[in-house]
């Protein structure tokens, strides 16, 4: 039996493009993955449309040198849920190591229309 495909193989193009752009610190490529009227909710703060998303990405993604390491992927209808370990230059005091967050991507017509980012609590 062959080895299973890596989680990246399961990703729709806009999700794969977003993660690649984050890891490459490529702001233009990151913003290009979003539809014009998209929304990002990052830890309960909302950013709408390309200008809002661009400002958020510059500050929170590029400015913090964020790096995403995928741990798991679940597809649910038009949504892709990615559990990932995050690293970067952000203040890590009080955060678990590794920092695990869940990205909830909604896509339409080859663009991200909604992204919700949460640090979920363990059920243990």
Question: Each predicted region: which residue ranges?
Answer:
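A beta-strand edge to alpha-helix "cap/lid" segment located at domain peripheries
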Residues: 2-5, 55-124
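Alpha-helix boundary/capping residues
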Residues: 22, 34-37, 60, 119
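Glycine-centered loop/turn positions within well-structured domains
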Residues: 28, 36, 113
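A short gly/proline-enriched turn/hairpin at secondary-structure junctions
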Residues: 37-48
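Short beta-edge strand/loop motif at the mouth of beta-sheet-based domains
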Residues: 47-56
């Amino acid at each position: 039996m062959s080895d299973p495909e890596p989680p990246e193989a399961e990703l729709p193009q806009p999700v794969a493009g977003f993660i690649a752009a984050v890891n490459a610190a490529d702001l233009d490529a990151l913003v290009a993955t979003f539809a014009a009227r998209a929304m990002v909710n990052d830890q309960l703060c909302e950013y709408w449309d390309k200008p809002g998303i661009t400002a958020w990405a510059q500050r929170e993604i590029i400015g913090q040198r964020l790096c995403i390491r995928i741990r798991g992927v679940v597809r649910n209808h038009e949504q892709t849920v990615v559990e990932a370990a995050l690293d970067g230059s952000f203040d890590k005091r009080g955060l678990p190591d590794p920092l695990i967050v869940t990205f909830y991507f909604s896509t339409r017509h080859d663009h991200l229309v909604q992204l919700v980012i949460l640090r979920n609590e363990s059920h243990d």
